[in-house]
Amino acid sequence: MIRNFLNFLWNNTSLRFLIINTIIFAMDKVRCAHLLLKHTGSRNPVNRNTGMPVTRTKEEAVSEMKGYLEMLRKSDNLDQEFRRLATAKSECSSARKGGDLGFFDRNTMQKPFTEASFKLEVNEISDLVETDSGVHLIYRIA
């Protein structure tokens, strides 16, 4: 009975097209969290969590983020530590959710962010990624 149903689905050209495209669409998304540090040259140099203007230079943001990256790479529980750090330090409103940005496709985020996100394996952290928004660390959740 199940085999007949699957054959029906597969033999129906419209349904086959829908099934294949649904699978491809689902596979072409990632779920990531990030930690964002803004700097005076950022597109909007305001901390989204405090409403305060950001006064650090780009070099200071990079230096601070390198410290976080080193700490995360030494962590025994990357997922938990990343979310804790993103909640405490990220200047994006996603900090309230441990930096979780949810699922997104290749056309949602800024190009450098997208490229880095899609290169990551699940449970992997990026190197520093610079965008117009600031300096990011990206953690791929799914």
Swiss-Prot record:
Keywords assigned by UniProt, alphabetized: Host cytoplasm, Host nucleus, Isomerase, Rotamase, Secreted, Signal, Virulence
Primary localization: secreted
Lineage top rank: taxon: Eukaryota
InterPro entries according to UniProt: PPIase_dom_sf, PPIase_Pin1, PPIase_PpiC
Residue ranges occupied by any PpiC domain in the UniProt entry: 34-142
GO molecular function, one term: peptidyl-prolyl cis-trans isomerase activity
Gene3D superfamilies from the UniProt entry: 3.10.50.40
Catalytic activity: [protein]-peptidylproline (omega=180) = [protein]-peptidylproline (omega=0)
EC number assigned by the record: 5.2.1.8
Ways its activity is controlled: Directly inhibited by juglone anti-parasite drug. Not inhibited by buparvaquone anti-parasite drug.
Localization per Swiss-Prot or TrEMBL: Secreted; Host cytoplasm; Host nucleus
Top-level EC class as recorded in UniProt: isomerase
Assigned GO CC terms: cytosol; extracellular region; host cell cytoplasm; host cell nucleus; nucleus
Signal sequence coordinates: 1-32
Subunit structure: Interacts with host FBXW7; leading to FBXW7 autoubiquitination and subsequent degradation.
Role this protein plays: Peptidyl-prolyl cis/trans isomerase (PPIase) that acts as a key virulence factor by promoting host leukocyte transformation. Binds to and isomerizes specific phosphorylated Ser/Thr-Pro (pSer/Thr-Pro) motifs in a subset of proteins, resulting in conformational changes in the proteins. Promotes host leukocyte transformation by binding to phosphorylated host FBXW7, disrupting dimerization and promoting FBXW7 autoubiquitination and subsequent degradation. Degradation of host FBXW7, leads to stabilization of JUN, which promotes cell transformation.
PANTHER family (UniProt xref): PEPTIDYL-PROLYL CIS-TRANS ISOMERASE, PEPTIDYL-PROLYL CIS-TRANS ISOMERASE-RELATED
Protein name as it appears in the record: Buparvaquone-resistant peptidyl-prolyl cis-trans isomerase NIMA-interacting 1
Organism for this UniProt entry: Theileria annulata
Encoding gene, per UniProt annotation: PIN1
